[in-house]
Amino acid sequence: AIDSSKAIAIIMKNPEFADVRSLEGASPTKHKAMPIIAVSTTSGTAAEVTINYVITDEEKNRKFVCADPHDIPVVAIIDPDMTASMPPKLCAATGMDALVHAI
C-alpha cells in the first residue's frame, strides 16, 4: 500500500505522469509528491524511508521499480510490534527482503 500511495502522491503533483508506467526507473518528475505518512506493517523494501517503490502492472503481468527523490514520505511510523502478528512465512520473506536491501 505504501508503494501505491507513493505513486499516487507523485502523480497528483505531476499529472503528466498519469500513466504510472511512465514512472518506471529513475523518474524525471519536477515537483515534490503530496505529503505521505507511511505506516509500515512488514519489513522489506523500506519504501517508507527511501526514494524507491515497486508497482505491479497487471496488464503486462510484471512488476517494475520506480525511484524518485521527490517521493520520500515525510513521516514513517515503524512499530516492531506490527510484525509480531505476521504469519511466520511472511515474516521470514519480508525479513530476508530487508536483509538483502541492507547488503
What are these regions (language model features)?
Residues 12-103:
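A glycine/threonine-rich phosphate-anchoring loop and its flanking beta-alpha core
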Residues 1-6, 46-49:
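Short glycine/serine/threonine-rich phosphate/pyrophosphate-binding segments
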Residues 3-15:
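DPxDG-like acidic metal-binding loop motif
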